[in-house]
Amino acid sequence: MNDALIKKVAFVTGGGSGIGEASSKALARAGAVVAIADTNLLEAERVVDEILAEGGIAKSYKLDVSADAAVESVIAAIEKDFGGLHIAVNNAGIGGDLAPTGDQTPEGWRKVMAVNLDGVFYCMRHEITAMKKVGGGSIINMASILGAVGFAGSAGYVAAKHGVIGLTQTSAIEYATDGIRVNAVGPGFINTPLLAALPQEAMAGIEALHPMNRLGKPEEVGALVLFLASPDASFITGGYYPVDGGYLAR
């Protein structure tokens, strides 16, 4: 990657923890200017402070991606603050209700769709507009291994992540000639604060779902995000790339 990302402007949603935090730090270490958005502004500010302490450049923004007007406002602010947008990591997401499809509520379904699918769409529509102004860019959408298979009890989450992959593939075709690459990453079960709160027995069961018999690390996903953001991935668009310890190969 060399110095190719130095001073490139990257926008990361859900950047205050987990995969978003790891992706933000990976991009910053490669020289990118990172705009970190999160519903939890304190966590976003913590990540910014840690990046600044390492000599990087970053700024925090409070954002709920389920509100299109809020997304538009934050991206406009990033353009004003840093002069453009070159990289976007649409990572913000929630888990949703755990229940069989027939027991899911319309309210729960709508909530997970609003963040996990609508939020990606809202971000993309404004990111694409911004990237056209600078001659192109790279959009990385955080899907999931559950964007490729089913998982009992998670109908809303699974449907949303399948939708993210379809949106990624369609947009990659539509904007290839504009120099905008669009790819999706499919993390397996990653050792984030959400999973770390589970009992040890439950953690062991989740680890066993992966042939590598462990959880992934946020930094392992961040490394792929960094590659897809870079010119090293210049002929890669419309793809879906699992980071799953062999989960989908079972």
Name the predicted role of every residue range.
Residues 144:
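Residue(s) in the substrate-gating loop at a strand-loop-helix junction
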Residues 3-35:
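Canonical Rossmann dinucleotide-binding motif of NAD(H)/NADP(H)-dependent dehydrogenases/reductases
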Residues 121-124, 214-243, 247-248:
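C-terminal substrate-recognition "lid" of short-chain dehydrogenase/reductases
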Residues 99-101, 105-110, 195, 206:
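Substrate-binding pocket helix/loop in short-chain dehydrogenase/reductase
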Residues 129, 173-177, 234:
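Alpha-helical segment proximal to the catalytic Tyr-Lys
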Residues 124, 160, 168:
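Active-site helix of classical SDR
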Residues 4, 95-98, 149, 209, ...:
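Short C-terminal tail/terminal secondary-structure segment
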